[in-house]
UniProtKB/Swiss-Prot annotation:
Gene3D superfamilies: Malate synthase, domain 3, Malate synthase, domain III. GO terms for cellular component: cytoplasm; glyoxysome. SUPFAM superfamilies: Malate synthase G. This is Malate synthase. The active site is at 177 (proton acceptor), 466 (proton donor). NCBIfam families: malate_syn_A. It catalyses: glyoxylate + acetyl-CoA + H2O = (S)-malate + CoA + H(+). It comes from Oryza sativa subsp. japonica (Rice). The gene is MS.
Length: 567
């Protein structure tokens, strides 16, 4: 005889009023998405979302002025902040005095987090931003990974290799990079609106890990963060408010949280003093985010045919505007008593070619020697294999000192070196070629395909690439097409046009298919990536961020994930 058994209750997240979770339910995720942690995140959203909206509108307003011909400049209204000698940032916490080598990588996969913490670097920056594709699974597993890393319990078993991964005796100090202010989190709704992504990243991590971090590797300070994509000190002011609210709710002292700001937009280079001043109780210095800085240079001057970039490979730190940016950052940080961090070494070991591998390492050594001689206190590496070479360069130059903040050392500190607005805006020089267009397309399409498939940190042609790669590639292609740049095609001049790009995309897609194999090409999202990349490069107006355009393609909603369950 049949019986009508009651349906088992569906698993769902226990959410406070006004919060809805649209991501897939998972018991591990539920331990992160608790009622109290979500209430904390919702409180941040409600207090600061108005200020964030205002800041984003001011960004758009500034871009309209640049499009009309105005140049970025130092703000006359804040000259007293820049010129005042009577203020400094809070003293550097002992736990992060030595930051000579920092390794960066996504907060997920778990094995990668363990390897980075065990890499021998002084700091591991776990990334929720450019190195992570922000799928629901990646974001939540990243939170689980960081909670376990701070607790010292993170492990991973590779069943295929029969290998167990766990933390070593002296793991790197953890910094966390949340997303930029512009990115939403569509799987978390607060009062019916998508949450601000960075406040979800920050809020969940801080809520679950601040106490364990401070009692462990933070030595009564922390947690520590990297803050990306800012364009103005008003955006730093919002972070200041977020930090102060978090400290108050956690019952920890003001200034416990510390953050390094990535100077990776052209407008921000004119706001470095002001950014440090806003965050002076919470500052852990500034970092040269040089790849996104190049992207921002193109975006800022998108309407200016006199600002065309040469091939991406030629836009390095030898360019005057890039060298000036580095020198001003060092001067600013050391004047205010904080770290001036160098840029990324993106090379990865070349296992099957010893000569090529040594040549790549030599390029890294030269770049890092330039940085430490200029006055940088530390630098970034994308792969553990680079760390011994970088440590040798920095430690050899520093001679036992943890940094050179107080040493007045380096090229940037020489008397008479004054960086002007003209220095920071000098157009870069070099050739523009069809091969550059092809390389941008080949790399850009492959990165977008990987990002759509859930990978945000991608090895391509012996470099570890993140979203900055795709951004530089697509904005440079767009710039060349928009202004009809003349490109060198092996001694023949051709004009950049949509028709030329269409031919290049066709050829490069075939090349990528040959490189990765027909089956992987078919199963991957290469065709979709090619369409997105082509559309971005030929759009009448330049989109602010490629990742905003592509984000909806990785959002997967599960409407019954929040309480009360919807049966």
């Amino acid at each position: 005889m049949a019986t009508n058994a009651a349906a088992p209750p569906c698993p769902c997240y226990d959410t406070p009023e006004g919060v809805d979770i649209l991501g897939r339910y998972d018991p591990e995720f539920a331990a992160i998405l608790t009622r109290d942690s979500l209430a904390f995140v919702a409180g941040l959203q409600r207090e600061f979302r108005g200020a964030v909206r205002y800041a984003m509108e001011r960004r758009r307003e500034a871009q309209r002025r640049y499009d009309a011909g105005e140049l970025p400049r130092f703000d006359p209204a804040t000259r007293p902040v820049r010129e005042a000698g009577g203020w400094a940032c809070a003293p550097v916490p002992p736990a992060i005095a030595d930051r000579t080598v920092e390794i960066t990588g996504p907060a997920e996969p778990r094995k990668m987090v363990i390897n980075a913490l065990n890499s021998g670097a002084k700091v591991f920056m776990a990334d929720f931003e450019d190195a992570l594709s922000p799928t629901w699974e990646n974001l939540m597993r990243g939170q689980v990974n960081l909670r376990d890393a701070v607790a010292g319990t993170i492990t991973y078993r590779d069943a295929a290799r029969g290998r167990e991964y766990r933390l070593g005796d002296r793991p790197a100090t953890l910094f966390v990079r949340p997303r930029g202010w512009h990115l939403p989190e569509a799987h978390v709704l607060v009062d019916g609106e998508p949450a601000i992504g960075c406040l979800v990243d920050f809020g969940l991590y801080f809520f679950h890990s601040h106490a364990a971090f401070r009692s462990g590797q933070g030595a009564d300070f922390g947690p520590f963060f990297y803050l990306p994509k800012m364009e103005h000190s008003r955006e730093a002011r919002i972070w200041k408010g977020v930090f102060e609210r978090a400290e108050k709710e956690a019952g920890i002292g003001r200034g416990s949280i510390r953050a390094t700001v990535l100077v990776e937009t052209l407008p921000a280079v004119f706001q470095m003093e002001e950014i440090l001043h806003e965050l002076r109780d919470h500052s852990a210095g500034l970092n040269c985010g040089r790849w996104d800085y190049i992207f921002s240079y193109v975006k800022t001057f998108r309407a200016r045919p006199d600002r065309l970039l040469p091939d991406r490979a030629l836009v390095g730190m030898a360019q005057h505007f890039m060298r000036s940016y580095s020198h001003l950052l060092i001067q600013t940080c050391h004047r205010r008593g904080v770290h001036a961090m160098g840029g990324m070494a993106a090379q990865i070991p070349i296992k099957d070619d010893a000569a090529a591998n040594e040549a790549a390492l030599e390029l890294v050594r030269k770049d890092k020697l330039r940085e430490v001689r200029a006055g940088h206190d530390g630098t970034w590496a994308a792969h553990p294999g680079l760390i011994p070479a970088i440590r040798e360069v920095f430690e050899g130059h520093l001679g036992g000192r943890p940094n050179q903040i107080d040493a007045a050392a380096g090229d940037a500190a020489r008397a008479g070196v004054a960086v002007t607005e003209e220095d920071l805006l000098q157009p870069p020089r070099g050739a523009r070629t069809v091969e550059g267009l092809r390389h941008n397309t080949r790399v850009g399409v492959q990165y977008v395909a990987a990002w759509l498939s859930g990978s945000g940190s991608v090895p391509l042609y012996n470099l570890m690439e993140d979203a900055a790669t795709a951004e530089i590639s697509r904005v440079q292609n767009w710039q060349w097409l928009r202004h009809g740049a003349v490109l060198d095609a092996g001694g023949v001049e051709v004009r950049a046009t949509p028709e030329l790009l269409a031919r290049v995309v066709e050829v490069e897609m075939a090349r990528v298919e040959a490189e990765v194999g027909a089956e992987r090409f078919r199963r991957g999202r290469y065709a979709e990536a090619g369409r997105i990349f082509s559309r971005q490069c030929t759009a009448p107006e330049l989109d602010d961020f490629l990742t905003l355009d592509a984000y909806n393609l990785i959002v997967v909603h599960h409407p019954g994930a929040s309480s009360p369950c919807k049966l």
